Amino acid sequence: VYTQTPRRQVNLSAFYLKPGQEWMTTLFLRRMMADDSVDYLDVTPSYSMREINRRIGFQDHSTGMVVVPTAAACWRPAGTCRLLALRDVPAGALSPAVMSLLARHHRLGCVALVVEMEGEYHPLILAATGRKGVAGVRVLLARDRALIRAVLGPLSRHLLGRGLFYLEYDAMAAPDDIPEALFWRRSSPVQMTRAPVGEAIDLTFSEFAFIPSPKLAVALKDLPQRAKHRVLRWSATDRISAYADPVTGVALQLAEYGIV
């Protein structure tokens, strides 16, 4: 979306390295990646594949995952940002190609929204994910991480109302301006053979959109109703307590509901 010149990209999500066969991998990948006009991407490399990728030209574009509890971030003000559903986007605000991209990801089960900020419109795509049975979303497409931070309040409220308890996105370091966020260094780094333009996150049509976890589907089945009847009906005192100590408050609520 954010590249000046459209390029072909090959995702190595289906590449499997059999233990004990590492010596063959480098030669195989070098032959497979002989076309310099193609960008190569690996968003879920195993520990052994990460080092092999680096040797053949991949660069790390993240060192961990920023994880933001939506129950803690939902108190943030909207500022000048506004979230729009696809049906509410004004005609001509985004190109037909971008609107088609959003619609196709929406049909795949992703959260597809448009952010209106200072008179400009930006696509935002999130894919369902899960950690230890807790449902959340991962950012697949955003102009940059600054846009995510700017819209974090209304976005967290939107997600929490749908039973999604955290938002995560890949990054090189923990953000200084999101104190409620955790930085998970054990997540796989995003590796690419070509540096992305600017600070954009673009993992559209990756395995996160096509292959959701089977366990996650079961966990998500009744979460919206549980969130509607429990999380969104906290008393004022409960809400203040959770805000004062977000991590503890959210953890206690999740434990109470039997989610963790």
Predicted regions and their residues:
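Acyl-donor binding region in acyl/amide transferases
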Residues: 2-64, 133-187
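Short, mixed-charge, low-aromatic patches
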Residues: 5-10, 106-115, 196
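Aromatic-enriched hydrophobic runs in primary sequence
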Residues: 27-30, 52, 102, 108-109, ...
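Active-site/acyl-donor-binding loops of N-acyltransferases
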Residues: 44-87, 143, 161-260
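Amide-forming acyltransferase catalytic core, primarily the GNAT-like/NAT-type
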Residues: 54-140
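Generic structural signal of hydrophobic/aromatic residues within well-ordered alpha-helices
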Residues: 97-98, 155, 227
